[in-house]
């Protein structure tokens, strides 16, 4: 089931954006494009379907089928019908996902609603080109729901009050996304720089590692979960992250990937 992900206008242009700009190259061969799309489908990777190039609103979806003969791409339908109708009226989607830890971007035209295996789905033309963003250092991985990583942020409240603790939605060596309580007015604001934030990365029942980092809030938006709850989503960028901390995060990401592959093997997928 697709998840609606909506970001507010509280997005900042970071002065460090050029430092993390990723090299890329375009794929224009139809067979090679289909190869990548099939790989994304087999990995069951989520895709962010943006309504426009400069949009902050996206539907989280996945690829259901790739049909080279009909030149069609079939993707999961969104849970928010209003947003679905806006997308169908525009007939265009900007798609962002990952394949083998490489960020993938492509555009889809001629968007339509179809029936696929007894349910609604999006149909679009197979893209004419596909862009691969090569830098692996900032590969983002979704954290565990059952054993979540948490970020403790001091200095948001008075000295005699407990610090604020947020669960992580995802993490990379370049930053992380936090989630607040449903329908909460988050204390975090775009553009704010926070120091001495502690990030606890759990392992198998024990603490995997704990790091301290300075962060800048890149955006504050909302995410609508599968259960219908609307929660603040806070995108953060690490500032001058020490090499030791970066390595700990990379090891944690590797551990999560190993766990995911193990679950896929055990479930037969």
From Swiss-Prot:
Transmembrane segments: none annotated. The keyword Nucleotide-binding applies. It is found in: Bacterial flagellum basal body. GO terms for molecular function: cyclic-di-GMP binding. The keyword Magnesium does not apply. Coiled coil: none annotated. One of its GO terms (biological process) is regulation of bacterial-type flagellum-dependent cell motility by regulation of motor speed. Residues 134-254 form the PilZ domain. Its main location: other. InterPro entries: PilZ_domain, Split_barrel_FMN-bd, T3SS_YcgR, T3SS_YcgR_PilZN. Keywords: Bacterial flagellum, c-di-GMP, Nucleotide-binding. Monomer. Interacts with the flagellar basal bodies. Belongs to the YcgR family. Acts as a flagellar brake, regulating swimming and swarming in a bis-(3'-5') cyclic diguanylic acid (c-di-GMP)-dependent manner. Binds 1 c-di-GMP dimer per subunit. Increasing levels of c-di-GMP lead to decreased motility. This is Flagellar brake protein YcgR.
């Amino acid at each position: 089931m697709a998840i609606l992900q909506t970001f507010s206008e509280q997005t900042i242009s970071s002065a460090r954006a050029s430092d993390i700009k990723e090299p890329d190259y375009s794929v224009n061969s139809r067979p090679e494009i289909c190869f990548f799309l099939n790989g994304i489908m087999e990995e069951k990777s989520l895709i962010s379907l943006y309504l426009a190039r400069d949009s902050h609103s996206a539907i989280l979806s996945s690829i259901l089928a790739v049909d080279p003969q009909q030149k069609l791409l079939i993707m999961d339908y969104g849970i928010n019908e209003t947003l679905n109708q806006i997308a169908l009226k525009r007939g265009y989607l900007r798609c962002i996902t990952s394949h083998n830890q490489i960020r993938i971007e492509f555009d889809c035209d001629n968007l339509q609603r179809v029936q696929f295996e007894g349910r609604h789905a999006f149909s679009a033309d197979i893209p004419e080109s596909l862009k691969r963003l090569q830098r692996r250092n900032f590969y983002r991985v979704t954290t565990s729901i059952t054993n979540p990583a948490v970020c403790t942020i001091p200095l948001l409240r008075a000295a005699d009050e407990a610090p604020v603790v947020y669960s992580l939605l995802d993490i990379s060596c370049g930053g992380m996304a936090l989630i607040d309580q449903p329908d909460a007015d988050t204390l975090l604001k775009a553009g704010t720089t926070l120091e001495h934030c502690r990030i606890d990365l759990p392992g198998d029942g024990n603490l995997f590692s704990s790091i301290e980092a300075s962060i800048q809030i890149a955006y504050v938006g909302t995410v609508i979960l599968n259960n219908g709850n609307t929660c603040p989503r806070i995108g953060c960028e690490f500032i001058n992250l020490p090499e030791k901390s970066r390595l700990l995060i990379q090891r944690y990401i590797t551990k999560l990937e190993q766990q995911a592959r193990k679950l896929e093997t055990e479930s037969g997928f």
